[in-house]
Amino acid sequence: MGQSGRSRHQKRARAQAQLRNLEAYAANPHSFVFTRGCTGRNIRQLSLDVRRVMEPLTASRLQVRKKNSLKDCVAVAGPLGVTHFLILSKTETNIYFKLMHLPGGPTLTFQVKKYSLVRDVVSSLRRHRMHEQQFAYPPLLVLNSFGPHGMHVKLMATMFQNLFPSINVHKVNLNTIKRCLLIDYNHDSQELDFRHYSIKVVPVGASRGMKKLLQEKFPNMSRLQDISELLATGAGLSESEAEPDGDHNITELPQAVAGRGNMRAQQSAVRLTEIGPRMTLQLIKVQEGVGEGKVMFHSFVRKTEEELQAILEAKEKKLRLKAQRQAQQAQNVQRKQEQREAHRKKSLEGMKKARVRGGDEEASGIPSRTASLGLGEDDDEQEDDDIEYFCQAVGEAPSEDLFPEAKRKRLAKSPGQKRKRREMDRGRGRLCDQKFPKPKDKSHGAQARRGPRGASQDGGRGQGRGRPRKRVA
């Protein structure tokens, strides 16, 4: 019999391949898409649609609660390898979209001029193409008109490029490109158009009948005499099935693409179908850091050099005060630790001295204060156990003459000393809280006939006495 299962070499190769895949996945940029504040149902749905665009390199089931601050999200993003935050928020007048780069910034703040959800875009199309396999790979980013219009435009282009993994046009697998994200910059209006498309590659140069045969759904040829009628005239096909192609979307494929008729070095047409969402954005400001920092660019506010210098000085003063508070807090913590350590040492020394003093008193024969007052804990527990045993066996409290030491020890206790706990654990029963009754015409002979623990010798069933009552839990 041959060896079953994989060999050692196969297992090692599989483990190395998995490790390489994990490293490659971790090297790609990842993102969080969420909302902040009271945004409403439509903005929340827009955030879900944008999250759909960023798949699969995003947290698809991310839930951010109201009590979670931005610092909490940043703290979680570090161990998970998240590099970007896409945050949607809403005020009374406008909707804002923030793009943050972690961990040190910058932060780009956009105003959402117009937007359309996925359901709005899909409902306006006659035929839409959207399936789950399209979202197994990140989209292809296309930037248009991001020319030399300023440093802020260049920064925007860099931020959008870093959202997705880079590709090598000579080594990329065309089967992994299923979607396209187009961002177009209009220099006149200074607005960005955000569009999301689905990519479909179809062969060209074939008749409509041949295209119909290549589709998965076979056409109805019950009215035809021969298949040549379908290929020659395209009978039974509507004019709406013919999609116009031209030089703008026809190209020669460098490699075979999934689909019927898409062979290598053959002419094929690349068709785009919008699947949403849409957004029209306008850059408001660029900040250093994550959410808070120096404003490097603002579309509406222009500050002079004096104002910028005053802002810088105020920020430096704030940082100095913060450093002073942190230093003072560290000193306070150190001082409290030293005080705690000194108190602990002093307590240990006192306990040691008390132990030595007690040993000297025992060696010299001087009774302690507790022993002189007759308040030994062992004697108290012994006496209380005897009283409890008598109550359980006889069913009533013992007489005062039977346990004379109990009363004397209670009287000897100082007022400040805690009384012994009267109620014992549930498993041991309860002590009798009744006072010692005076003896009623009982002779010394009757008392002498009792056992060593106060119980009668006949098992508690003396003359005129019934069975002992059950112990009260």
UniProtKB/Swiss-Prot annotation:
Gene Ontology BP, a term: rRNA processing
Pfam families attached to this UniProt entry: Brix
GO CC terms = nucleolus; preribosome, large subunit precursor
- Write down which residues bear the modification named Phosphoserine: S238, S240
| Chain intervals with Low complexity compositional bias | 324-334
State where composition is biased (Basic and acidic residues). Answer: 335-360, 422-444
Q: Which SMART domains does the record associate with it?
A: Brix
Quote the subcellular location field of this record. Nucleus, Nucleolus
Positions of the UniProt region annotated as Disordered: 323-473
Q: Which residues does this entry mark as bearing N6-acetyllysine?
A: K438
Task: Mark out the compositionally biased spans (Basic residues).
Answer: 407-421, 464-473
Q: Which UniProt keywords apply?
A: Acetylation, Nucleus, Phosphoprotein
Q: Name one GO molecular function term.
A: rRNA binding
Question: Which InterPro entries has this protein been placed in?
Answer: Brix, PPAN-like
Signal peptide span: none
Residue ranges constituting the Brix domain according to the UniProt record:
29-292
Question: This protein's superkingdom?
Answer: Eukaryota
Q: Which PROSITE patterns match?
A: BRIX
- Primary location group: nucleus
What biological function has been recorded for the protein in this entry?
May have a role in cell growth.
Query: What name is this protein filed under?
Result: Suppressor of SWI4 1 homolog
What is the organism of origin for this protein? Pongo abelii (Sumatran orangutan)
Q: What is the lineage of its organism?
A: Eukaryota, Metazoa, Chordata, Craniata, Vertebrata
